[in-house]
Amino acid sequence: MSRRNRNNYLSIAAVRTIGLDFIEMLEETNRRSISDRNTLTDIYNTEFRDRDGGVKDPNFSRVLYALRNANKARLSRTGRVYFNTNVRTGLHDQWFRPRRRQQNQANATPGNVSSVTPSSDQGPSCPESGVRARRKLVKYILQRLNTTDRSHFIADKWGVRVSSELYIEDGKIRISVDEAEVYELKLFVENTGQEAVYFTYYTALCWLQYFTLEDSRKVTRNNPLRLEPREKYEVIVRFKSSHVGVYSATLAFEFKKNTQPTTRSFHIVRFIEAEYRSKLAALLGPTEPYKPLRLNISEPENCIIDEGFPPDGYLQNFLVNVLPLGKYIPPPDTTILAELLKEDCSSRIFRGKLKDLQSLLQSPLTFDNYAERFDLLLYLEECQMHVDIKRYNKDSVTLHRDRDKRLMGLNLPGVSENRPSVLRGDHLLLTKSEEVTFSNVTKYKGYVHRVELDQVKLGLSKRFLKDVYIDKMKFRVEFTVNRIPVRLQHRAVHMAVQHNLKDVLFPMASRSLNPVSPPALRLFDRKLEYNFQQYSAVCNIVAGTSKPAPYLVFGPPGTGKTVTIVEAIKQVEKNIPDAYILACAPSNSAADQLCEKLITSEHVDAHKIYRLYASSRNQKDIPKILKDNCNVDEEMIDFPCKEDLMSYKILICTLVTAGRLVTGGFSEDHFTHNFVDEAGHAVESETIISVAGLLNAEKGQLVLAGDPKQLGPILRSPLAINHGLDVSLLERLMTQNDLYKRGDVEFDNRYVSKLIMNYRSHPYILEVPNRLFYDGELKACADEISSNQYCMWEHLPSKGFPVIFHGVPGKDERESNSPSFFNIYEINILVDYLKKLLLTQPKKGISRIFPKDIGIIAPYRKQVEKIKRAIDADKDFQDYMGIDNLKVGSVEEFQGQERKVIMVSTVRSSVKYISLDETFNIGFLKNEKRFNVAVTRAKSLLIMVGNPMILRTDESWGRFIDFCLERGGYTGISITSVERIDDVESRLLALNIQDEETEESPVQRYVDPEFRNDY
């Protein structure tokens, strides 16, 4: 192919790449400021265009067109050329002048290094430099990585040593700076052998604008340096950044033993990690090196339980038990199956019962295997719960006598945050510290009578108090799992089969041969009449158009699904005289919200509404407005008799507490309508507690409201999760049942209503999740005064765009025996924004904000703890009124909530842990639901902090960051001037990265979620 034809075939992308190389050459020869087009053309033609000594590149006009097309250059009216200031700049790559090179080649002798040409099996040893040489070297090292381990590249070899004035550990040099000044690091290339070697080339394998390289002899392949024995040569690395964070560079040094063409080059790689730390970062750093904790899950051979005494006098139970609740103890086969599956054993190992269980686990859910499959999944989950809770076991703990001489006090930091959950009526096990390793031990059962902040009051046996306990005696404390919820789920799935709920759980179609049109209702909340989707949902629920199939209210964030459910409940009560309604939710807070909205609306007689709490509910957590409509009276919890409970038209409780109604003998014909709000938060078997035995499949109507695009229930067993336990009934129906799938245009309103009016967020905050998860159908309908409140905030990178992505090159760290990750550099940025929000006087048009209006979200428990510590330690916040009302928590803790301002710390800043996130479904990366929840909590201002190079490996995050770039909302570390992190670095650093060997679930290790107590 001729030179002319070759250039014609080049794509615009290829031409643009040539242009970027030219800009880099200008930068590296200190001529970037030149803007005269004629001068640039001369430089291009004389020094760059034929730099390979072969085929010329396209003419300068074509290159300039490609750069302008990509917004990398612009041409003024006067004919001057201005290159984008953010075009990649960075590590100097020792360019050369091709004309001089060609002259040298013309005069080369066989012994001259310039005559070296690569053989087909050699490393990149051709006499070229600059970007192309670097890329060639990168490709070469990548190919070698397929067959060679990391140690090969970091090892000194053939007598050549690459050292530093600083300590080098495993090929890495760490430098730390505490101010924005130039830091200079000296690297020494030394020949410790007996023969001379040639230092032919050195470069960075990835580009970062914060480093520069320099050496006095300007070593390139065209200007190699001969190193005599014992000779040492200096290479200077300079670092400077104005942004706190961690910056990495991977440097490759190339050498040859001689200048013969057939001589193979060899390489030595060094990693440089520069940390620019603030005082806050120093305060929050690791307390001690991370050492994985191996849990002790062994049990003594013989164990005697010394029974304590449970709390009494706080419960009046008039609801007689009619249907007993089975024990449902996990069989031994379940534990064996879990171990074999965890070890990824060959299927040939499975025999008999284990083979049947494996087959059941791998089979799809049907009504025929419904109970058995859920039994197995629940057993797997429970086994993991028993393991995970052992992380909280404490050794060498002392007790103290309470003022109530029947009780003992025990300090338990973390119990106030449900880590672990400890409720009244639960029990703990105490073992004398000196007897922990004995094969025969006595464990003393202590029942929880009261929970007071981080202290519990235990009721132990009289024998313990009188004969065993001595002041300052030390014990191991073991926590236990409350099995009631999981037992209720087992019973529910079996009752679902016994009561033949197939048409509810696996619906085919409505039985009505002549389906009635939904009535034209006059709604109590008149605003809903102007929202077609909400109005349609209420009318179809009242008409029962889906029966016996459940009716689904698909409610994306901020679309008013709870308001819709409340209106539907009120309309059913009004229009169907013989209706009796059971309204449930997975959590007490969601159930309380339902009850509050019903009572305060005054459209239903409050005497018809009753809120039923579990016996473990703390009276302090019950809203005052519900005191007259619930079963809690001062310090007493009262379970009314069945007849009294059946007299209420609307009964509200959690899904788990609904199981108490089944135990109490409620008829399946009593409730005509069962509503489940936040149905996406519950596992299917938990939802079924409120259905099986309480709803007639022929006559009753089940209504589920939620969003399958948001986070589901928190589970611990990877096996249970991987085999579907994390899929809610709502999500299963919407994704696997044809009745609920979208048609050519929309959903079938007889079975499902998708709410599309968002009343929460500013349109720009809603933009990306709307496009990613909701087909672009959501319409921003929030109050403009509220949603636009921060559009003119002085700290916005782009006025009118209340979304910020702040790029931070941070560092994933762990400490002590906690495997949870934290990133102190992101915390530094978050605290800075918090001060700008709370401590600076708001300008005209921006009202003052209070801590309760701000939420900070992080995916890992340790990051949450560090953020809280940073706020507590900051003197500016110590006396700030209401600072305790600022919520910092995980994504799961914020689901269903909203704040005026949301700040998010993404934490992940290392490629080597991305596979960990994806495999175990933790963190933000590779988890669309967690991303969706995080970005949809904010009403007026959303601030994201993270590492853009890492996050852009994920599609959702990539779309979000690109959106911020397009709209001018990006700030922090420059992203357009940084080449995407090369595979070299990630593969060199991430070879054989594996999770620690432990019995704990990944969720427990990294996220450390609350143990549920909200039943």
Swiss-Prot record:
GO MF entry, a single one: ATP hydrolysis activity
Catalyzed reaction equations: ATP + H2O = ADP + phosphate + H(+)
Record keywords, A-Z: ATP-binding, Cytoplasm, Helicase, Hydrolase, Nucleotide-binding, RNA-binding, RNA-mediated gene silencing
TM stretches of this protein: none
Region (Disordered): 94-130
UniProt binding sites for ATP: 555-562
Extent of Polar residues compositional bias: 109-123
Enzyme superclass (EC): hydrolase
Gene3D superfamilies according to UniProt: P-loop containing nucleotide triphosphate hydrolases
Subcellular location: Cytoplasm, P-body
Top-level taxon in the UniProt lineage: Eukaryota
Record's GO cellular component terms: cytosol; P granule; P-body
Alphabetical GO biological process terms: miRNA-mediated gene silencing by mRNA destabilization; regulatory ncRNA-mediated post-transcriptional gene silencing
Main function: Probable RNA helicase. Required for RNA-mediated gene silencing by the RNA-induced silencing complex (RISC). Required for both miRNA-mediated translational repression and miRNA-mediated cleavage of complementary mRNAs by RISC.
The protein's name in its UniProt record: Putative helicase mov-10-B.2
Source species of the chain: Danio rerio
Organismal lineage: Eukaryota, Metazoa, Chordata, Craniata, Vertebrata
Gene: mov10b.2
